[in-house]
């Protein structure tokens, strides 16, 4: 256990940040999974495609924000965005 007051404060701060990052990562995974499911189940009609475009844009924005905040590594964020784009291209859906 930490002896100094600053070390104790740092432990509390680290725990608070860990919990915040955990919730953000969980939200990010949820958006990513929703996006993958939406891509796989789309029928290329106009309404579904527009909703899908919006969902992909939101997901990519959330990934970028997670990278900016240091929650995920930049390479991890780039890989996630590339996988989304690859799945869209396989389904022949343009953004």
Curated annotation (Swiss-Prot):
The keyword RNA-binding applies. It is found in: Plastid, Chloroplast. Residues 76-95 are annotated as: Disordered. Coiled coil: none annotated. InterPro entries: Ribosomal_bS20, Ribosomal_bS20_sf. The keyword Transcription regulation does not apply. Keywords: Chloroplast, Plastid, Ribonucleoprotein, Ribosomal protein, RNA-binding, rRNA-binding. One of its GO terms (molecular function) is small ribosomal subunit rRNA binding. It comes from the Eukaryota. One of its GO terms (biological process) is translation. Binds directly to 16S ribosomal RNA. NCBIfam families: S20. Belongs to the bacterial ribosomal protein bS20 family. This is Small ribosomal subunit protein bS20c. It comes from Guillardia theta (Cryptophyte). The gene is rps20.
């Amino acid at each position: 256990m930490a002896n100094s007051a600053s070390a104790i404060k740092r432990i509390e701060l680290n725990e608070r940040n860990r919990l915040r990052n955990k919730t953000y990562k969980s939200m990010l995974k949820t958006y990513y999974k929703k996006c993958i499911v939406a891509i796989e189940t789309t029928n290329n009609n106009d309404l579904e495609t527009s909703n899908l475009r919006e969902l992909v844009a939101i997901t990519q924005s959330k990934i970028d924000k997670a990278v900016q905040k240091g929650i995920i590594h930049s390479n991890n964020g780039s890989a996630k965005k590339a996988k989304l784009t690859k799945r869209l291209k396989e389904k022949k859906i343009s953004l």
